[in-house]
Amino acid sequence: MNNKIKTAVAGTLLASASVSNAGITWDAGEWTVDMSGNVSSFAIFSDAKDTTGPKGGLAATQRSNEANSNSTSISTGVLPDWLGFTATTRQNDIDTSVTISFQPDAGGNAALQGGGNSGNWQAFLTFGDKSWGSVKVGKDMGIFASTAGMNDMTLMGVGATGGTEGNGVNFSSSGADTTMGGIGTGYIYADWKGQIAYTTPNMNGFLATVGITQPWNAEGDKVTSAASTGGSDNFAYEGQASYSWTGDFTGKAWVGAFYQDVQNLQGVGIAAGGTDADAQAFEAGITTTVMNIGLTAYAYSGEGAGTTGMLTRGFDATGSARDSEGGYLQATYVTPMYTKLGVAYGVSKLDDNTADAGKNLVKENNRITVGAYQPLTKHLILVAEFSHVESESHLSTQSDSEQDIMSVGAILFF
């Protein structure tokens, strides 16, 4: 792969990974400080084909009071704008670091609101040594599904914009903070979580990370899907193991798992006082590069894990877990002009149960994306994408909702 593409991809991972690597660095006493980040913006053109869709659908729908199915926005893509600082030092034979980052965004579709929101997705410390591994304490990207997300080619672009998920509006016309990319159409969002995690040393390409993470509440409307509120007396548990290899045929294979005891589930079919249930998920993936061709395959399955976001619509209104599964296939090719061309297909499915069979609940969200990513410099990339998103309902009388999305823009890493 050409060095320009390597730098671009490395920059993408840099903005999403745990500890930043060599952006702008300087020494401050015993510490080395690194500042890095990215800025992007895209012109997004959306054509929502339908006025209604299933709950949990990611194909945006027309608003009931709007005759025009088209919408436009200027927004950040999948990655928010990013500014991160990492300070590292080695004392008493221990490598230590602290990372804090900020995420201002370009979204917003109304006056006097400042044009989007700001986030604080990372604030953590690490300590360790290459002989025994490292420990992370604080808020960072979750472990489960993180590698699937970082290998998604739409990370540098827009992908899906989102439908009735999230704020329940057409994201592409609302000026939402970020777009969805392949989240919910191929993998569950890893999210940003408080955690204590241990990562092994690199053992000839083998790495493993296990950790306890902040337990999530289940998300639902309590009519179609149960929801939970309040705290939990147990953590969530996540882990991932991977093996990487180099040479003419480079690549990485990984497996992962998630488990949480979800407490205080409430719904119309649950007795007063709520109930508890287990949520679990498993994943496997592989990504390879041969000359200028990149291939990625990923799959996951869950019980109670839900779809799009972890524990979102994972339980029916009686508190019973729903099964979910999905994955994506992706192929990219770097031309002699350094343009990275890619195509990806992803799908996420959510089963219904006996208690809610045939309701207007999302059965499947799928997406196909074709994209072109052209580096102008080591750090600046022009992006053009087209995505088609479909959402299918368990309700037989509800037609599938469809959306076409075109986007052009630029992203710069430093």
Task: Please describe what each predicted stretch is.
Residues 2, 28-30, 90-92, 130-133, ...:
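Outer-membrane beta-barrel channels and translocator barrels
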Residues 24-45, 67-218, 233-235, 243-245:
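Outer membrane beta-barrel
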Residues 33-41, 96-100, 135, 206-210, ...:
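Transmembrane beta-strands of outer-membrane beta-barrel proteins
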Residues 41-47, 91-93, 102-106, 141-143, ...:
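Transmembrane beta-strands of outer-membrane beta-barrel pores
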Residues 84-86, 124-127, 197-199, 240-242, ...:
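Outer-membrane beta-barrel architecture
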Residues 238-370, 375:
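Detector for outer-membrane/organellar transmembrane beta-barrel domains
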Residues 376, 402-414:
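Outer-membrane beta-barrel "beta-signal"
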